[in-house]
Amino acid sequence: MQPIFPHFLYGGDYNPDQWLDRPDILERDIQLMKEARINCVSVGIFSWARLEPEEGVYELDWLEAIIDNLYKNGIYTVLATPSGARPLWMAHKYPEVLRVNHTLTRNRPGRRHNHCYTSPIYREKVRQMDLKLAERFGHHPGVILWHLSNELGGQCFCPLCQEAFRNWLKEKYKTLDALNAAWWTDFWSHRYTDWSQIEAPVPTGEMETHGLSLDWNRFVTHQTVDFARMERDTVKSVNPAIPVTTNHGESYEGINYYKFRDVVDIASWDSYPLWGKDPDDVRVGQETAFAHDVIRSMKKAPFLMMESSPSATNWQEVSRLRQPGIHMLASMQALAHGSDSVQYFQWRQGRGASEKFHGAVVDHYGGSDTRVFREVSELGDRLAHLDAIVDSCPKPEAAILYDWENGWAMNNAQGPRNIGMGYLQTVMAHHASFWKRGIPTDIVDMESGLTGYKLIVAPMVYLLRADFAKKLREFCASGGTVLGTYWTGVVNDTDLCYLGPTPGNGLAELFGLRKEEIDSLYDGQYNKLLPKENTLPKPEYRLKELCELIRCSTALPLAEYGSDFYAGSPALTVNTFGKGKAYYLAARGEQELLDDLTDRLIKEAGLTPALDAALPYGVTATVRFHETSAFVFVQNFNPHPLTLPLNRPYEDLETGRTLSQLPLKKFEVRILKATR
């Protein structure tokens, strides 16, 4: 789609509904926004009680005055639907809109995210509210994007959701016999004989039927996505030209975000890294890069960073201030990974309630002569000169598999490591190896296409769907390189174990081996991986937590275990499959092993780094492409300066100078331009 704006969106959550009795503050907001070069704000996210103070009584004039005044001053509006928190009158008149928690107790009114996505009454009230907003503002020239609800998520166990779950299961399985077979309910004599017997998994009920828990998580995602789709259809019924987004949280495991890819026009998320927690911020930079890549990969297009803090939060365990330079670094990192915006929560600090101490562009002092406002203004000035980058996007040659349903199944599997299988952490560790080398990666799930990639890294694909197994085999046979790992191809999509050789569904043939056993080590216990000659640069690597015992058929062993009763058996293999190669890492190593193995894979697959230079610790590079240009973001996460020799000349996008070496200040990001 066409970019919604010719500039990077710059602004944040604006809550004028909290200041309607202070017109002087609303007027001052406009002055300060101009001073900081704000061009866009998100309005109305939690304004429902002001928009509909009584049932059926809509008061939108104040909102129109706000949007008109913003537009008159060159500031555009991302207009939110206020379904993230409903007014108290609704909860008291219609208790069914409130969630029932996992103890099967209905919540009291209060908080936010305390509503049932299934409730027909809530859906109708949301639809009516959204339609009023769309009819009033759907053709307003200042409204450029719809912001659906806020940080969708959570579960409800009310009777309405239970019945909707049963209907969802009927649609999926058709018969109870099929459901019982898929869930293996003869175990413990839990066979269902009537649909009404099925209940959502709760601690006081059924929790060990793994297919039930897996399908419940799928259903929760389905209801949440369906709710968002209802909101999208409502606002677009008036003007389908205005795109929609909904803001996600970071790596929230309760909802499969990728199911939103066909609902929203633009993916977005809220970024709140724990800057300052470690001795340096390199690990935080790696983890944040992964989160950016997850959201960008949802649509494989530019995304929006809808929220971030310009200083501290107030809801994390410790509210550390961003050190000087970190604000610019964090904001430019978002752009580096494909964001077309830097948005804050919040524009102005409120005077009361739970986020009164959350960081904001304008604090309780209310002036522009603060460190935070100065840094925000500096970023605004910089963004105003980077229009050439807008709507460009990374085009990675490598992809890493992260699949929500696989994670749900693995975390509920009861073995082999009940103190934590570490699925997400393992995926992020593989991602970090590429990040440190300046190799861009997409994050894909099992529904994603694999066309266009040279390398697929698929860690711990415990739940292996048949269609993905087929795609992976075809990818490798056509010349692609694949890395698989331990605990792959164990169960099917209803969490039933594969019979016969595993990895199942043809992956035993792809990797040229079969798994026999898996050893789970206690914390503090280790094994060794001993590479064969010319395989990896070090003579040994430490292994921990999970060690799989495999038997090779056509695979060539590249390394073996160094201790325990399985010493000498294969720990790393490669198999030629069609025109490609399939590597298999049978044990969990530390980052050093993944880094060195990644170097081999990068060379084998012929991946192109974002920057033609050797990257030292704490420095990475990412690249965004237009048709004829490449914009390379070189990011220094170190608290000290350094100079980076370049293997070829680059143009500094912001100065126009040609560089053969690149000086970097601490926490600095510089943007280089190259011709494709």
Annotated model-derived regions:
Residues 6-10, 37-39, 71-77, 139-144, ...:
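Short, well-ordered coil/turn segments that N-cap beta-strands
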Residues 195-198, 261, 272-676:
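Carbohydrate-binding surfaces of carbohydrate-active enzymes
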Residues 10-20, 46-61, 108-127, 149-156, ...:
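The substrate-binding groove and active-site-proximal loops of carbohydrate-active enzymes
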Residues 19-35, 126-132, 249-260, 323-331, ...:
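Short, acidic/polar
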Residues 27-105, 230-238, 462-463:
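Aromatic-lined substrate-binding rim segments of carbohydrate-active enzymes
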Residues 91, 100-290:
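Polysaccharide-binding and catalytic clefts of secreted carbohydrate-active enzymes
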Residues 1-25, 30-40:
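An acidic-aromatic substrate-binding cleft motif
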Residues 12, 33, 41, 70, ...:
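Conserved, mostly hydrophobic/aromatic
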